[in-house]
């Protein structure tokens, strides 16, 4: 258990061997509910090489003085990461949906909203 966000690691060992290693992290929010974004790599057990980096966004709840993982979402490829970036930039662009403008007029049927 971790009492602080600094104590949380995304590294993971299997039978004493590091199979997931944290490369970097960004704390997105702090408090009773904290959100941390991790950049990490996983070991390919067949080739003994590290696979392409992935991203995990993890929500933690502080309960009885310790942070406990509540949920997570993995971004598994650069293509998926770039699609997420493009959508957020579009939504928050001047005049975009999140910026109070009409934004993109896609309907639910063609992938919007």
Located regions from the model:
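Positively charged, low-complexity terminal tracts
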Residues: 1-82, 86-113
């Amino acid at each position: 258990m971790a009492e602080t966000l600094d104590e949380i690691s995304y590294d993971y060992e299997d039978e004493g061997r590091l199979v997931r290693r944290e490369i970097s992290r960004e704390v997105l929010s702090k408090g009773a509910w904290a959100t941390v974004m991790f950049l990490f790599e996983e070991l390919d057990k067949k080739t003994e090489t590290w696979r392409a980096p992935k991203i995990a966004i993890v929500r933690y709840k502080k309960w009885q003085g310790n942070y406990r993982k509540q949920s997570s979402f993995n971004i598994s490829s650069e293509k998926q990461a770039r699609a997420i970036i493009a959508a957020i930039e579009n939504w928050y662009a001047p005049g975009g949906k999140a910026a109070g403008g009409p934004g993109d007029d896609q309907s639910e049927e063609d992938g919007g909203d």
